[in-house]
């Protein structure tokens, strides 16, 4: 059972403030490749006044996370296409080289999954090892690339001290229920002078617009400044940049126990302004939904994922009002979400016999509009419920 925390999991302080409370937050798990099931939980998002980091104050417990990771995250293959994942890994390796990371020594990837990225590091000259609890993915890493994986969640005790020259943890830290302990583990296993590279969602750019930035399986929410603070508290120093909605921290283990951090006032002000904008945005969108209901227009959703769950959790939209669900990923077509009784369809279906209003719920907002252009040309309506998708089209730029 989830319990409310009374101390910050990042810095240990007790000066916590509630930002948002959601009575029923919806999220999906996938028992198999062909099933999707709703879960509904209360959610409280808060802010630490001591370190400026946002987090869930009622975080998921280990049982809930195990269910998510062993199913929705554990289904193999993933929804992402092989070419898409290969391009992500290629681009990230080029980023590391440009950042001055030596392609030599021993490397660890936490959350290594099927070993594709480690294979690239291996080809570049590193001796590699993975850490991931997913047995199917680890087996694929060994079969396809000869990459060995420690089947476990990373902790300070998973590997001996000073084992690695480089550690990568991409889109992992936001999932960790004890982030301070996790970063302490990185400090232990990375040799002095070695490097770590982390990726986490850039919640700062989303908060600035007043859009939801939370996911149930993400207990932690970082801005560029709060991520760098967390690294410096553990003796890492470097830079944080933003790339298409993702923060990238490349930091060196200085050997110091900790380093000074900057003032948290900017992040606290950002969080307070977010709360005001979020409440205003939800109120305005609920007014639009009320008008759609008055007109008797049937509503469909384009996009099935975190934007969809936040749409249902943050606004007055009820799942019973949805007449159709569309998604641009062919791997999802035909899947039926338990409780909705609606199969996921190709967005091309909209152009054939679209509903009254399509609610856009995906990061691919510009492409979605192009995909349903015939529907829009003949008078169909599309609404962007939350501003988040547009933000994630931004190019790379320095954030800290």
Positions of PLM-derived features:
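Hydrophobic, well-ordered beta-alpha structural blocks that scaffold small-molecule cofactor pockets
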Residues: 120, 248-400
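Short aromatic-enriched loop/helix-cap "lid" or pocket-rim segments at secondary-structure transitions
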Residues: 22-23, 29-31, 207-212, 337-338, ...
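Conserved SAM-binding loop
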Residues: 93-210, 221-236, 249-253, 309-310, ...
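General small-molecule cofactor/ligand-binding pocket signal
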Residues: 17, 150, 239, 345, ...
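A generic structural signal for alpha->beta connector loops
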Residues: 13, 125, 146-147, 193, ...
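Hydrophobic alpha-helical scaffolding
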Residues: 82, 172, 176, 217-220, ...
